[in-house]
Amino acid sequence: MTGSSARAGADNRLRGTAVCSDGEWRYGVAVNLRSITYTSLARLDLDAADLQAIHATAQRENARRNITGLLIFNGTHFLQIIEGEPEPLAQLVENLRRDPRHRGLEVRHDTPIDERSFPDWSMELVQVSAARREARDTVRKRLPDGLPDGVRNRVIRMTEQISGTVAL
């Protein structure tokens, strides 16, 4: 699905260059970025149409807010990493907490970052098997080249956790 993801703006990778939440380009301005990782439990009757709607809305709205990230779904649990400026991220997390399509949203990692791990993905969706090994292998293949080892390892470890073989 990498080719179908909305592009968040490759110029955003350049240090000191960013699209801010007001949509204005600012050069030479230090941009305050954060990365938030959360997990949640999907509604029992969530179907493929619901998942597609979540993905399409996330791509559209995240591109508008200059939020990038990755959404992993294993049929029962979501694992999502979102990156962007603090205010739009806080608003998104509050919206996600109120979304009836999932419950039990738990922020597992929230940290300042110097640069985005997923600069080209307004929201990439990776659907994985509930089986640990298959889920891990699928995620490994889909993660972008050049992803920092710490981020790669966290995504793989948390994918294993939502796959039920490691306690959350």
Task: For each feature predicted by the language model, list its residue ranges.
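Charge-rich, low-complexity N-terminal segments
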Residues: 19-168
